[in-house]
Amino acid sequence: MAGTYSSTLKTLEDLTLDSGYGAGDSCRSLSLSSSKSNSQALNSSAPQHRGAAWWCYSGSMNSRHNSWDTVNTVLPEDPEVADLFSRCPRLPELEEFPWTEGDVARVLRKSVGGRRLPSFSAEAVRRLAGLLRRALIRVAREAQRLSVLHAKCTRFEVQSAVRLVHSWALAESCALAAVKALSLYSMSAGDGLRRGKSARCGLTFSVGRFFRWMVDTRISVRIHEYAAISLTACMENLVEEIRARVLASQSPDGGGAGGGEVSAEALEMVINNDAELWGVLQPYEHLICGKNANGVLSLPAYFSPYNGGSLGHDERADAYAQLELRTLEQSLLATCVGSISELSDLVSRAMHHMQGRHPLCPGTSPARQARQPPQPITWSPDALHTLYYFLRCPQMESMENPNLDPPRMTLNNERPFMLLPPLMEWMRVAITYAEHRRSLTVDSGDIRQAARLLLPGLDCEPRQLKPECCFSSFRRLDARAATERFNQDLGFRMLNCGRTDLISQPSSPGPDGVNTMDDQGLTPLMYACATGDEAMVQMLIDAGANLDIQVPSNSPRHPSVHPDSRHWTSLTFAVLHGHISVVQLLLDAGAHVEGSAVNSGEDSYAETPLQLASAAGNYELVSLLLSRGADPLLSMLEANGMASSLHEDMNCFSHSAAHGHRNVLRKLLTQPQQAKADVLSLEEILAEGVEESDTSSQGSSEGPVRLSRTRTKALQEAMYYSAEHGYVDITMELRALGVPWKLHIWIESLRTSFSQSRYSVVQGLLRDFSSIKEEEYNEELVTEGLQLMFDILKTSKNDSVLQQLATIFTHCYGTSPIPSIPEIRKTLPARLDPHFLNNKEMSDVTFLVEGKLFYAHKVLLVTASNRFKTLMTNKSEQDGDNSKTIEISDIKYHIFQMLMQYLYYGGTESMEIPTADILQLLSAANLFQLDALQRHCEILCSQTLSVESAVNTYKYAKIHNAPELALFCEGFFLKHMKALLEQMPSGSSSMAEAAKSRAWTHCRICRAP
């Protein structure tokens, strides 16, 4: 027993590497890590893992090679460890996710730099699609918790969630991908509603499905579209990162150009050996960071400044500094410490090292970062004490303090090593939480949130909106400023405690009284509105609080302002958290119902309270705000009545439609249209007369009320979001009001209805296709719309749906005639007088067809086609020169006679081919490789093609390799499909396959200049 205890203690001692704070072999570790020769020797003996180029073993690992052997070989094979993980809580298994295996396969097939990459097997794609679910759930859970603060999920919550879950390198890569997608989306404002979100962002995954998934999983009651774009881009980028690492392991040069198919086993081997991927893709609720499947700890590759280069002999000062950094690198892999002083020293040195290596924030220009360099983050004493609570090791405490004897018996079970994250991951997660709060200080709350994420079985409530949660460091302030800040904090705490009698006390929050703002840019009234403290709100109103004061932009005076909360008012906070009584109290006191939107310019846009209530689906709040004069179209108009140029703005109709709140949308539609003059663009002025004539011709069937131009534009945007997110009922309801279709909206609605097998809706959509203007037709109709409609044609059994599809195909084909089949002008190499046709005189070969003899001449046949030449040669070799009769089967005598007539006449000019024999002659011409005769038969078939014979002719053309005739039949199907379906509905499947293969070749929009 003593030996086991000694071995365990020795392993813990080596793993913690307390850098001289009492561990017996710390000096040995220090000397080993600074010796290049020793490190190289240990590197050569260490096992090499495939894919290890994506993360590196630091020198600290080399100095403890024996301890790592213990971790690698003993712990994973220990049944107790397997049993330990089996008891850990697991991530939920959800049924629906916003991608399919086909989507993942398309991302994996995307070329990089024009290079053709190896393909992934179907099993590898299926496995990767399943593993991605775990990464998505982790990011979504963290975004859900971060969104509690303001009851809204924006791109900032998603980006912080990605940084919490992924390593620094992966998170930075995902952030860059999100910035790229958002930039492309913003630059495609001119496309408006003509293209889908994914196409505008340059993404393969569906942004609309991700948005719908975020709504269905209730990440927040409000989802910003930029949040969905960011999450989509991050997940797609993760697939590309995994692909790059797998291909790098497959290729000898690491370039990913190796041949062969990537198997599921190769995929899993790379993931298991990658410390940045393995933990994220595990099924357990707690996040395993900095370890691979073997339990090997590692730091991020870019954290270490060493690339294997040698140091100069005369650079002693630099060598000493690098030695200190290498020792720090070892220490950051510690999973437990022996004293609070040791922990404080490690954290302090690590933060000092990280400040010099802080990467440029994605989306921030280098010039701006140079003008406003990031402030260093400090750790509060309570944060260090809380972190020490989770990293404390009783055995090491005894070694740190010789006067402290280890306990004879322990009351608590120690966490096994496999469940302990390294110190580096504790710091990474805690710093990310602090940065999300825009705080310069890591507090104990950040450590508790990190413990919940990193350790199994722990939980704590999300951060709440409180004044004390964003204190800046008082160390940077002089005595006077620090005293004022302490008094301000005391005033906020007094007002936040809920006692209304403290408002009149001398300790006011600041020089502005009850309108003083804290680091987050919030006033006491905003905090009271967020918490729903009606009594405190009333007292602050009576004390003269400004109801319409706005949250300022980020500044040194207010360093912790959340970017999305700028220009919010007290009414905004009350609406965000759904406190109806507080909203009514503020409105009764004179708060502006539109918040800050009326007095804000384009550069200070903020969502109105009605928009926030519409997104949340709060029917009572929407009704209250509408009754007080809130304008649902305010985001579509500026103060001068001009349409907003901020294309990312969503009006109230769009917010309710995007989140699927049908009852709220109906309530918004009951609001009477305000009599505001429409300001038209030049394009709208030129098109106004045409639109009015179209409207008058349609009559009143479009809807009961004539919509104004502004409301029509707003409702059309709402249709776009409802179609993108799969809310077909809302889309159809808006269409019933007379909102005109956009082609993309129609295609998305048709796709959703078809996938849900709602054929009644499909029928209505197909019937409404004729209302789409032809100038709306674009490439999407060819690549997506026709493909979808042909899929419906193949699977639908509804006669009405088939007839409507036929009408659409005929309409798309247009009135132009089917392109004719060109003749082949070919002169036969040899000719004989027609007198010798089937003439026994001078004949040197005889054919036996249907028991009848047919006399011919070799000189003509051998030069006519290779088929005849082969036939003659094989016959001579088999039977010798004595037998001159060649039997021809499967061809009728008169068909063979017409075939020979073509050869002896030298063409088709003098031939008369009966209509009933054309197909048989075509088959014979194809058999004997007479191309000109076959083409002539194809032309004759096209001239006699009818509704009754079209399907059979098409099948005959496919069997006998007549491509021009098959192409002509496909055009005939498109042009006469309605009549074809009426004549023979059983042939619809064949026609669907035929027309689908060449539909876009014939479609009118493709032939347009």
From Swiss-Prot:
Q: Name one GO molecular function term.
A: protein heterodimerization activity
Task: Answer whether the UniProt record assigns the keyword Ubl conjugation to this protein.
Answer: no
| SMART domains registered for this protein in UniProt | ANK, BTB
Q: What Gene3D superfamilies does the record point to?
A: Ankyrin repeat-containing domain (1.25.40.20), Histone, subunit A (1.10.20.10), Potassium Channel Kv1.1, Chain A (3.30.710.10)
Ranges occupied by ANK repeats: 520-549, 566-595, 605-634, 648-677
Has keyword Cytoplasm? Answer: no
The BTB domain covers: 843-912
Disulfide pattern:
none
Biological process GO terms, please? cellular response to toxic substance
Among InterPro entries, the record links this protein to:
ABTB2_BTB_POZ, Ankyrin-BTB/POZ_domain, Ankyrin_rpt, Ankyrin_rpt-contain_sf, BTB/POZ_dom, Histone-fold, SKP1/BTB/POZ_sf
Q: Which Pfam families match?
A: Ank, Ank_2, BTB
Q: What does this protein do?
A: May be involved in the initiation of hepatocyte growth.
Q: What is this protein called?
A: Ankyrin repeat and BTB/POZ domain-containing protein 2
Provide the organism lineage as a comma list.
Eukaryota, Metazoa, Chordata, Craniata, Vertebrata
